[in-house]
């Protein structure tokens, strides 16, 4: 399938992540987020102002799609068709947790802090 996904921001706004999103940038909670047709990169936002409350975003991949997401800690998540990932814009100190529905491949950046994936009532 092709690279396509839908990003839902914590305020409910949706952004379609496809070839029309190439080169686009989002301002989220004072952070600059890079978008292209295959990857959404939050790691460039690392080191900028950290907010006090966690802000969650969600990427959903429709049937026939796939998409790669780079979390703010540098972890790469390759989401398959009919899958979604809910994740914080920035992780809390010492703890990295995301919620997965469906199927994904994680390339976890080794930071010395645990990385937890919650899926269907289980934590991995």
Label each PLM-derived region with a short phrase.
Residues 1-124:
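Short acidic/polar, Gly/Pro-enriched loop/turn segments located at secondary-structure boundaries
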């Amino acid at each position: 399938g092709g690279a396509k996904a839908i990003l839902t921001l914590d305020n409910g706004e949706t952004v379609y992540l496809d070839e029309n999103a190439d080169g686009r940038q989002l301002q989220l909670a004072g952070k600059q987020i890079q978008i292209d047709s295959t990857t959404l990169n939050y790691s460039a936002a690392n080191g900028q102002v950290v907010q006090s409350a966690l802000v969650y975003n969600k990427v959903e991949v429709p049937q026939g799609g796939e998409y790669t997401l780079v979390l703010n800690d540098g972890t790469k998540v390759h989401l398959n068709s009919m899958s979604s990932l809910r994740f914080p814009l920035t992780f809390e100190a010492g703890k990295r947790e995301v919620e997965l529905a469906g199927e994904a491949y994680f390339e976890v950046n080794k930071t010395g802090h645990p990385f937890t994936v919650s899926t269907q009532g289980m934590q991995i």
